[in-house]
Amino acid sequence: MWASAALLFFLQSADYTTEGLKALDAAKYDQAADLFGKAVAADPKDYAAHFHLALSYTMLKRDADSLAEYKKVLELKPGLYEAELNAGILLIRDKEPADAVPYLQQAVDQKPKEFRPKLYWAQALLDSGDLAKAEQQYRAALDLDAKSAAAELGLAHALAKQDRLADAVPHFRAAAQLDPNYRDGLLELAGLFEKNHQNAEAIAIYQEFPENAAAQEHVGQLLLESKHSADAIAPLEAAMQKDPTAANRLALATAYLFEKQFAKALPLLDQSVAAEPGNYSLHMMYGRGLRDSKKYDPAAQQFFQATKLKPDSREAWNELAGMLYMLEKFPESLGALDRAHQLGDDTPANYYFHAITYDKLRALKPALDYYREFLARSKGEFPDEEWKARQRAKLLDRELSKR
C-alpha cells in the first residue's frame, strides 16, 4: 500500500542505510526506525533518510511520528510524489480525510494516469463530505482500472450519500461481482433499503445470504413488520439455530405468537423472561401469550410481575384484572380495576368490567351503576357489550326494586 522510492543514493551514511533497508525488508521495523533515526541525526537534511524513517514509523503505527517525518521530507524535497501519497494515505487511516485531500490531490496532479492516488483522493473526498467531487474521482479511477472493486464500492457510497440509491445499486453489485471480499457491501445496500422503507428490496438481498444469521434475522424482522409473520418463521428459525441471541429468540417467539403457535412461542418467552426478569415488556408479552393459550394462572403471574416493575401501567393492571376475573378471583380483580381507574383509565371498558365483576359478586347496586355508566359512555362503540349491559341492567333494576 505504501509508496517507496529508490532513494538509497541520497543517503549520507551507507552503513545506516544498508542495515536500515535490510531491517525494513525483514519487517524489523523497530530496528529500521532506530537505524534511520541515526542516519537523520547524522544528516538532518537527508530527505531520503527522513522518508525511510517515516515509512518505518508507519509500519509501527506510530502515525504522529510518521506524519511529522513525511512533512519534513516535503519541506526538504517539495512535491516528492511518494511522500505526498503516503502522507495522504496515513491521514485517511487516522480518520483525518480533510487534511489528506491536499496531499493526495498533489500526488494526482503529478501522476494523473496513476490509479492509486486517484482512488485514495476519492476516498478522502468521500470521507470529508465532498460527495460530488468524490463521485467524479471514483469514476476517473474506474476509467483507469475498470476492475477495481474498491472503486466501485466507493462510487456506490458516494452516490448513496447523495440520496441516489437507485444509481448506487449497480455499483454495489459490481463490487461484489469483481471481488467476493466485497460481497458484504450488499448487506450494507440492504440496510440502506431498510432505512429507505424499501423492505421488499432489502428482503431480496438478505435472502442471498442464507448462511448469515444476522441477515436471516433481518428477513424475519422485516416480514414481521410487513405483517407476513408466517413467512418470517423459516428465516427466524434459521437465524435462531445459527445464532441463538436474545433478539433472535424474541423475534421468533413474536412470529409464533402471531401465527398462534403457542406451544412453540411460550418456551421461548419463558427463556426470555428468565434471562431478563426486569424487562416489563417481556412479562407483558409472555402474559398475553399465556392468556391467549388460556393459561390464566401463569398469565396472571406475569401481569402481576409487570405491575411490580411498572406500578403506573394501566395496561398491566387491566390485563391482571382480566386474568383474575377468569380465575374467578373477583375481589382481587376489582382491586386491579380500581387501580387502573386511579391511574386514569376512564374508558367504557373499565366501567364494563367493573359492572360484570360486581355482578358476579352479586353486588347489585354497584353493578347496576357501572352498567349504566358504561352505557352512557359507550355510545355504540361496543354494540355486543351494550346489548348485554342493557339486559343485565333491566334485570338488576327489577331485582333491586323488589327489595
What does each model-identified segment do?
Residues D25-A26, M59-L60, R93-D94, D127-S128, ...:
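Register position in tetratricopeptide repeats
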Residues A6-H52, M59-K61, A68, S401-R403:
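N-terminal leader/linker segments that initiate helical-solenoid repeat arrays
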Residues S13-A14, Y47-A48, Y81-E82, F115-R116, ...:
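Helix-start (N-cap) detector for alpha-helical repeat units in TPR-like alpha-solenoids
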Residues K38-A39, K72-V73, Q106-A107, A140-A141, ...:
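Canonical positions in the second alpha-helix
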Residues A42, L76, Q110, L144, ...:
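Structural marker of alpha-solenoid helical repeat scaffolds
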